[in-house]
Amino acid sequence: MRVIRPVEHADIAALMRLAGKTGGGLTSLPANEATLAARIERARKTWSDDLPKSEQGYVFVLEDSETGEVGGICAIEVAVGLNDPWYNYRVGTLVHASKELNVYNALPTLFLSNDHTGSSELCTLFLDPEWRKEGNGYVLSKSRFMFMAAFRDKFNEKVVAEMRGVIDEHGYSPFWQSLGKRFFSMDFSRADFLCGTGQKAFIAELMPKHPIYTHFLSEEAQAVIGEVHPQTAPARAVLEKEGFRYRHYIDIFDGGPTLECDIDRVRAIRKSRLVEIAEGQPAPGDYPACLVANENYHHFRAALVRADPQTSRLVFTAAQLDALKCRAGDHVRLVRLCAEEKTV
């Protein structure tokens, strides 16, 4: 059974292996052992309530409970921007007009923004290419909503997710090349690495503080504003079906979109409910895929099961109960994995 669980110190080798497969552009998963070890330590301290809210962040891994192999990672930052400033560009409009000359120009413009300060953030979603099957990506992404639903008081009203922008296999970012590089005087990969390893002071020091007309950027850069990396398109679609929307905020490095949603409007959070579990053999049937998660804060587990989403009682085998860290008589959180398609 493949389960989502809290990260542990022993996962460092697995995280390094995953980081080596990202191809760059995933700022929060750098192939740097010291940085990843510090990230694990911060997550463990978050679970033990040893950090202020401004520093808290949860990290989860997707594990095969039989072999112990780790094939994916996902994370939640509790409140961004309360220590280091949280930057986006807001894509807006400036109008230049003259009645005398009969000229009216509405120009797309980038405004430096800290509007998402204090929001909870979904981040560091990466699944090993060999594991991209059997619904693993859905489970990895949406398991965080089960945790947030169970421990709602730990998180803020708005949830954001920065989507990876357009970067080629050589680490070339059209948006960075046309804009960021002119102010930071370094390649995208270098800026990405510095940010991922916590060296963020240079952002505040070198960021352009004034609005930027997008027409001044290359056509290639303009074309990727708000667009995602091809490998990230499925992750974007997953979040949009959960209620997330692009509200014209983009990443300052690669121009990728930032999606956002009020936490209580996220489908999986809103629709999930608690059901009792029993031990036995699950009844056969053609049931839809569902997410199930325990309510154990320190030993959280989530997994994919086939079940009736409307049931009031789930039956699991002894092996499933063990993998989910549950016992008969406990209550688990249940929700349909994907929203039902509306029919006309």
UniProtKB/Swiss-Prot annotation:
Gene3D superfamilies: 2.40.40.20, 3.40.630.30
InterPro entries registered for this protein in UniProt: Acyl_CoA_acyltransferase (IPR016181), Arg_succinylTrfase_AstA/AruG (IPR007041), Arginine_N-succinylTrfase (IPR017650)
UniProtKB keywords: Acyltransferase, Arginine metabolism, Transferase
Pathway stated in the Swiss-Prot or TrEMBL entry: Amino-acid degradation; L-arginine degradation via AST pathway; L-glutamate and succinate from L-arginine: step 1/5
EC number per UniProt: 2.3.1.109
Catalysed reactions, as listed in the record: succinyl-CoA + L-arginine = N(2)-succinyl-L-arginine + CoA + H(+)
Active site positions, chain numbering: 229 (proton donor)
Pfam families: AstA (PF04958)
One Gene Ontology term of the molecular function aspect: arginine N-succinyltransferase activity
Record-linked SUPFAM superfamilies: Acyl-CoA N-acyltransferases (Nat)
Binding sites annotated in the UniProt record for succinyl-CoA: 125
A Gene Ontology BP annotation from the UniProt entry: arginine catabolic process to succinate
Keyword Cytoplasm among UniProt keywords: no
Task performed by this protein: Catalyzes the transfer of succinyl-CoA to arginine to produce N(2)-succinylarginine.
Similarity annotation: Belongs to the arginine N-succinyltransferase family.
Protein name (Swiss-Prot/TrEMBL): Arginine N-succinyltransferase
